[in-house]
Every structure is written in C-alpha cells, then in structure tokens.
C-alpha cells in the first residue's frame, strides 16, 4: 500500500477551509475512486489529472486508486483541486515523500497536456491559508498577481505540472511574488460634464458625503445616468482592508483584471432592468456566486429604469440594504457575501416618458401604478429623492458647474468630520448611525426638530423616516462646516425626502 497527501482550499462565499487530499494505491482492479462530496466538475478531474500526469512523462498507477478529500462532510466544487490531486498521486508513487508538499497549499486546474490553468477565488483562498498559518501556497501563474496582494505568506506561480514536480523535489524554483500597481485608473467622467441640474448635483454631493441612498425621477435624456456614473468619483478611495474585501468578491465572480488586480476605487455596478433575482442578489447552481449587490460592495449600485425591474428583484434588495450582507442558502450550505453599497434608483415619471411632461398621455392611475411597484418599505430606505426636469436652452450658455475634484474635497472634509464624531460609537458615515443614538445622544435642538415633529404629526414620516432624515441633516451640517444640524439643515433634509417619486 502507498499513500500520498496534498492540501488545497475550498472557498464558500469569501471564507476558505483547508482541504486535505489523500491518494491511496492498493492492490486490486485498476480504477480511480473519488470520495468526499465532489461535484460534477470535480468528478471530471479524474480524467484531467490522469491525462496530465501521463503527458508529463509520469506513469499512472495500474492498481486501485482512491482519492479522498477531507473533511468528508464539506461539499467540494470546481476544478481548483486538480494540481493537488495530481501531486498526491505522484507523491504516493515516491519512495520518499516530498517535504515541501506537507507545508504548501496547491490551487489550480490542469489541462490534458499538464498546463496549469487559472481559477476563480484565489484571493480568498490565499487569505484563508494565511489565516490558518500556512507558510506557502502555489497558484497558477496567471493568478500570481492576485495572490501577491496578500502579505505574510510565500506565494509561488506555476505554469505546468512538470514544473511543480521539479519544485517539490527541490531541483528548480518557481516564480515568486509580483509587485503590481496599487491604484485603479481614475474615471474620465467628470461632474462638470453635467449641464444644469443644480439640485440633482447637490443631492449627489450629499449622498457622497453621508453614504445615503438616492432616487432620481426624471424624463429620458436629462442626465440621470451621467450623474449616477459620477458618484463613485466623489467617494474616497478604499482602505487597504476594503480593497482586499472588494477584490476578493470580484475574484470569486471571475471579474478581476490581470493588469490591475487590486481594486482601490469604489466599484460602479449597473445591472440591466431585466435582471433576475439571482443576478441581482447572487445565486446559481452549485456554489452561489456574488450578484450585483455584492459586486457593488463599498461602491454604487445603479438601477436604471427601476420601475421596469421585477417586483421580486426589488424586494430582494431590502435585506442587504438593512443588513449590509446577503446570505444565499443552497442545498450544500449557506454562502455569505458582504453587500454594503450606495443605491441609486432612477425612473421615468410615467410609462410613456415624453421629453415634455405636457405631452404625457398617461392617466393618473397609470402613473400611480407605474411607480407603485416601488414598495413603501423600499422607498422608506431611500434618503434622498430628487425630481429632475428637462433643460431649457439657457442652461447651455451658463457657466460650467464644479468639477469632480472640487466637490470631492468638500466630501472628504465632511466625511472626516463624520468619522471623528462617530468613531467612539463604531460608525464611519452618517448613513450607518443607529436611530436611538441619533435621537438620544445627538438629538438636534428643539427648534431644529420642529419640521420633523410637524411631519410626524401629519403622518408624513415613519419613525425610520425620522432617523433617516436626521442622518441627512447631519450630512448637510458636515458639508456646511457646522457642529450640529440647525432648522435649515433639518428642513432641507425633509424636503429631499418628500420630493421625487410619488406613490
């Protein structure tokens, strides 16, 4: 009997778990038996591994071969285990085990000729290896820039199975850590490109300062998409931990760029209005993959033509909006992805959507039904609502508005003021602050609260609406350089909440 052993990583969501792979060669009829809850792609690895091993000049054991992946109760999915399976088989045929194999995690898919192909989810796998104290990890050479983002662990890139064998024997080396640029190219979109729309521009600035959700109700062609695309440019760059978290999500989704693997700027995700629930919040067969809400984590999720999106997809947004994460239950377990994003909704005021509102042919009931798809609980979570109007000819002769860099400076100062205020309480932005904290310890003066009390008495606001209005008021105060909101900030925040879409 001969036994070989190698190690790999199973990724579920953004978490990784170490998988031990054992290859046992015993007397009996030749055959390969794979155990440990493998999926279809992993079952097919038997043929890939056998062809790769023999095509690299090695012999395949002419006996009964059992490949066991532990823990046995953990579902194993994908082709990431190929090179670990091959290494375990080759180790079982050696008279002396490879020492490096006991201290190295192996990730990668094999082609039939022994080339190592790139796989998804390398970054969360390497992070899991570092967390569990592994000294080294070998990844496909094409994934090496991504793996090199993790410090404190030895990462190596391999191109062929033969190259891996030579390294395990100690006869040759493998490519080491790659230093890549740590910046994402700045977007060429500038806020100065937007003509007119001063109220909507200011709403975007307030949204950036406090991380608030925003809704734009506007006729077609007025500039709602331009405004939404320029919101990420006003947001601060991601911190080191945020960059790794966002990059890990895009790694699992298979969307990383080989040139700039580290995402340092807030992402902008704009799914089509016909997207399904699974495309929006995540899902799919086998391992649940991140949806648009997770890909927009720490960035902006733009839903254009939101009144055309299915009701089930819209209602699925309520949980990530409230919790900042999405949990996807599948037969084999639950995958959890972070989903803390800024939501920007955009809708036409009616189905016919004429350029001039006077040309509208929709009945009043039709208009109510059109925007009525946006439920009260969903709209209640949107802090800023703006009704945009078509431009007049004079708007094109007016002076250009402020640029993105100018507005970004004010946003940065406002965010810094908010961060210093909320840091002792565990918050960073105004939109994250809990309602009880706002109402008890940071309650504005009695005079400043007058507009809110009036709206609450008239039934125009819910308690959650009061909390969200106070958050916007704090953002307005931060932009104005005030230490607390006054009656003007509270009234302005309330006006942002009471304009826009009407249900």
Curated annotation (Swiss-Prot):
Q: Which domain of life is it from?
A: Bacteria
| Gene Ontology molecular-function annotations | ATP binding; ATP hydrolysis activity
The family database entries (InterPro entries) matched by this protein are listed as: AAA+_ATPase (IPR003593), CHLI-like (IPR045006), Mg_chelat-rel (IPR004482), Mg_chelat-rel_C (IPR025158), Mg_chelatse_chII-like_cat_dom (IPR000523), P-loop_NTPase (IPR027417), Ribosomal_Su5_D2-typ_SF (IPR020568), Ribsml_uS5_D2-typ_fold_subgr (IPR014721)
PANTHER family linked = COMPETENCE PROTEIN COMM (PTHR32039:SF7), MAGNESIUM-CHELATASE SUBUNIT CHLI (PTHR32039)
Protein family per UniProt: Belongs to the Mg-chelatase subunits D/I family. ComM subfamily.
From the Swiss-Prot or TrEMBL record, give the protein name.
Answer: Uncharacterized protein MT2965
